[in-house]
């Protein structure tokens, strides 16, 4: 089963989760320090103990500096950090 761990369960994190599901990720779970629901399996600092169970992860915070900070942490720990781009996304030829 293709699974993904997302750090950040706010609005941006939920959008990333929907996109990940469109890409074929069957199990998507979150780490978040503030949001509490059934999809949130712990706090952000728990990323260190979740690596074996979820080797693929992304940081999905709206704040760019926070997203970069956590992406660096994930990479240092050895996580695979994929680009999550919706399959229907289109890039302009003039971009």
Please report, for each region that a protein language model flagged, where it lies by residue.
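Hydrophobic, well-ordered beta-alpha structural blocks that scaffold small-molecule cofactor pockets
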Residues: 1-51
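Phosphate-bearing ligand-interacting subdomains
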Residues: 35-91
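Short, intrinsically disordered, charge-balanced linker/junction segments flanking boundaries
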Residues: 93-95
